[in-house]
C-alpha cells in the first residue's frame, strides 16, 4: 500500500486513530507513560563496532544527527582484517572524527592481531603489544575521547586456553600491565560473546579476589533481544550476591546478522537497553567498516539510519514503555518538557498494533500526532526520507491517547511524534546538559534543574586527555550569531570559569559568578556564539586539549540558543 493510500485509511476521532479495512491483526499494544521519566536521554544505543573507517568515513554530516554515544574501534596499529578487508578504523586515527561528532571510544586491544578468532603467539608477544598500545595512547595528548580499554574480545569463544592458560589468570596479567602505565582510563570486560551466568560468576569472583574488576562490565547480545532484560537482571543479582558495587554495563555488540539491517528488531534492542539502564551499546559489526554497520551507504542514509535519526531527535527524559512481552512489539520513548514534545520509536510486530500514551496532560487537550515509518532497506539501498503515514490533530482525553498503526511490517521501524498544536519553537533552543556528550563528569538529579537533572563533578585533572568537558550537539536553522544562555550553579563563593569552543575553533572563557548552593539552579550567564546553519558542536570544558584549564567549579543545567 502506498503512503497516500495508507494515510487515507486512517480516521481520527475522540483522541484515537481508528483504522479502516481488514488489516491483519496482531493487536499488540505498547504503553508509553509520559508522566514516568526514568533517566535523561543520552542515546545509549547510538554507537557501533568499527563504525568509523578513516577520519572522514562516514562523513560528519551523516553522524551528527545520530548523537553517537560510544564506539568500539580497533587497537592502535590495527592488524585485524575482518571479512578479509584491509586493516582500518585505528582508534587513535579516527579519534579526531569521533571527537567532532561527540562520540566516546573504547579501544579493542586484541584487534592488533590480524585474524579472528585471534591466533595466540606468546605471552611476551601479547604483553609487548599491550605496552605499545598504551604508550601510543598516552603519547596522543590531543586525544581526549578514549573512555575504555577493552582487554579482550569474546574470550568464551576466542581464548586459546591450551596455549595461553586460564583466561581469568590472563585477565589479571593484562589488567595489571595496562594499569602499570595508565591508571585512569576505565577498563572494559570481559566482553563475552554471550551472557552466561556460570562463566560470569567465575570471572567476577576471580577479578574481585585479585582486585582486577573491570570498571565497565561488557558482554554481547547477538541472539535476538528476547533475553536482554533477563540477562541484565541476572547480572545485577550476581553483583549483589558477590558483594560487588554496581558497574556500568556496556553491550558493545548487539543484533544478529539479519536483524542489524532491520529497524523493527533493532528498536526492540534499544528499548530493552534503555529500560535496563545500560550505559552504552554498539551495533554489531557483520559486514563493512565505516558505515556504522549499515546506517550509511556511500554517505547516504539507509532505512536504518532514520531509526537512529529519530533516536537522535529525542531530548529531555526517557519515559517508561511497557510491551506486552519480551518478543514482538516494543519500543522506546522520550519527553522533552521544555518543548513539550513526545517521541516514540517502535517496531518488531506485523499487522495492526497500538501505541497507548498516558500522562499527556501537560501537552494540553489537543495535540498534533505524526506517524512515520522506515523500511528494512538493507545496507546498500539509500532511503532519502521516512514515509509519513499520517499527520493529524487529535483530542486528548484524561491525558490519554491511543494511536493505531495498521499494516505494520515486523522489520520496519515506526515513529510517533506528539506535540501541542501551537507554541512549539520552530527549532530546539534549549539543550539540557544531561543530554549532551559528557566526558569524565556525572549526571545528577535536582528538582530545581530545567528538566530535573544536571551535570556536575566537572573537573580538571591537569591532563587534557582525562579532564572534564561537555559537548552539546545543536542544530540551528540559519548561520548567524546566537545568544547562548547557560544555566549553572557555583557554590564555591568565588567566580569559576570554563573554556568555550565550538566546531573545533578557538577558546574563550565563560565566567560563572557564585550562587547560593550546589544543585540549586536559576542563575544564568550569557555569551555569543557564531554558528553555521545545521549541526554544530559547542564545548564547555574545565580541561581539554589545547585549553589551559578552567578555575573553580561550576555545575551545568542547560544552554539555550536564541
Question: Residue locations for each model-derived region?
Answer:
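Non-catalytic accessory regions flanking glycosidase/transglycosidase catalytic cores in CAZymes
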Residues: 15-148, 172-189, 300-303, 307-462, ...
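Active-site cleft segment of glycoside hydrolase catalytic domains centered on the general acid/base Glu
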Residues: 55, 115-238, 242, 255-269, ...
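Short beta-strand elements bearing conserved aromatic residues within extracellular beta-rich modules
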Residues: 369, 498-500
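A short beta-strand element within beta-rich, extracytoplasmic domains
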Residues: 468-492, 496-498
Amino acid at each position: 500500500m502506498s503512503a497516500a493510500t495508507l494515510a487515507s485509511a486512517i480516521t481520527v476521532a475522540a483522541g484515537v486513530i481508528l483504522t479502516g479495512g481488514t488489516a491483519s491483526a496482531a493487536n499488540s499494544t505498547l504503553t508509553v507513560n509520559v508522566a514516568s521519566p526514568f533517566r535523561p536521554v543520552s542515546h545509549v544505543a547510538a554507537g557501533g563496532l568499527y563504525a568509523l573507517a578513516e577520519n572522514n568515513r562516514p562523513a560528519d554530516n551523516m553522524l551528527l544527527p545520530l548523537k553517537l554515544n560510544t564506539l568500539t574501534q580497533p587497537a592502535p596499529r590495527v592488524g585485524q582484517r575482518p571479512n578479509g578487508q584491509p586493516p582500518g578504523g585505528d582508534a587513535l586515527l579516527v579519534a579526531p572524527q569521533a571527537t567532532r561528532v561527540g562520540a566516546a571510544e573504547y579501544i579493542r586491544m586484541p584487534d592488533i592481531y590480524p585474524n579472528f578468532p585471534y591466533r595466540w603467539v606468546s605471552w611476551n608477544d601479547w604483553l609487548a603489544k599491550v605496552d605499545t598500545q598504551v604508550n601510543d595512547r598516552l603519547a596522543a595528548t590531543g586525544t581526549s575521547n578514549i573512555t575504555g580499554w577493552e582487554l579482550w574480545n569474546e574470550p568464551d569463544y576466542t581464548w586459546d586456553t591450551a596455549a595461553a592458560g586460564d583466561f581469568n589468570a590472563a585477565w589479571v596479567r593484562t589488567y595489571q600491565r595496562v594499569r602499570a602505565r595508565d591508571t585512569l582510563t576505565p577498563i572494559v570486560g570481559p566482553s563475552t560473546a554471550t551472557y552466561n551466568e556460570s562463566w560470569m560468576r567465575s570471572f567476577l569472583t576471580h577479578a574481585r579476589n585479585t582486585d582486577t574488576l573491570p570498571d565497565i562490565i561488557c558482554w554481547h547480545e547477538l541472539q535476538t533481544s528476547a533475553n536482554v532484560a533477563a540477562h541484565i537482571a541476572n547480572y545485577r543479582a550476581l553483583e549483589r550476591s558477590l558483594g560487588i558495587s554496581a558497574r556500568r554495563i556496556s553491550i558493545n555488540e548487539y543484533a544478529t546478522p539479519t536483524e542489524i539491517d532491520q529497524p523493527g528488531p533493532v528498536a526492540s534492542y534499544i528499548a530493552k537497553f534503555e529500560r535496563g539502564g545500560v550505559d552504552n551499546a554498539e551495533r554489531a559489526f557483520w559486514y563493512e567498516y565505516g558505515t556504522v554497520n549499515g546506517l550509511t551507504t556511500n554517505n547516504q542514509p539507509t532505512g536504518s539510519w532514520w531509526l537512529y535519526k529519530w533516536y537522535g531527535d529525542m531530548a529531555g527524559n526517557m519515559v517508561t514503555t511497557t510491551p506486552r512481552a519480551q518478543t514482538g512489539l516494543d519500543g522506546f520513548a522520550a519527553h522533552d518538557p521544555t518543548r513539550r514534545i513526545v517521541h516514540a520509536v517502535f517496531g518488531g510486530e506485523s499487522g495492526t498494533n497500538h501505541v497507548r500514551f498516558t500522562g499527556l496532560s501537560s501537552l494540553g487537550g489537543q495535540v498534533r500526532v505524526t506517524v512515520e515509518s522506515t523500511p528494512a532497506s538493507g545496507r546498500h539501498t539509500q532511503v532519502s526520507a521516512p514515509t509519513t503515514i499520517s499527520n493529524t490533530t487529535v483530542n486528548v482525553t484524561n491525558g490519554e491517547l491511543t494511536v493505531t498503526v495498521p499494516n505494520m511490517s515486523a522489520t520496519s521501524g515506526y515513529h510517533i511524534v506528539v506535540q501541542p498544536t501551537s507554541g512549539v519553537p520552530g527549532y530546539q533552543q534549549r539543550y539540557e546538559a544531561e543530554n549532551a556528550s559528557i566526558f569524565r563528569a556525572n549526571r545528577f538529579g535536582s528538582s530545581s534543574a530545567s528538566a530535573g537533572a544536571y551535570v556536575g563533578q566537572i573537573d580538571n585533572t591537569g591532563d587534557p586527555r582525562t579532564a572534564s568537558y561537555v559537548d552539546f550537539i545543536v542544530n540551528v536553522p540559519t548561520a548567524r550569531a546566537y545568544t547562548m544562555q547557560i544555566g549553572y550553579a557555583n557554590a564555591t563563593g568565588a567566580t569559576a570559569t570554563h573554556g568555550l569552543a565550538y566546531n573545533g575553533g578557538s577558546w574563550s572563557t565563560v565566567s560563572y559568578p557564585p550562587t547560593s548552593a550546589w544543585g540549586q539552579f536559576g542563575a544564568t550567564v550569557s555569551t555569543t556564539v557564531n554558528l553555521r546553519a545545521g549541526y554544530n558542536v559547542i564545548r564547555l570544558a574545565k580541561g581539554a586539549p589545547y585549553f589551559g584549564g578552567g578555575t573553580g567549579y561550576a555545575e551545568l543545567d542547560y544552554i539555550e540558543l536564541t
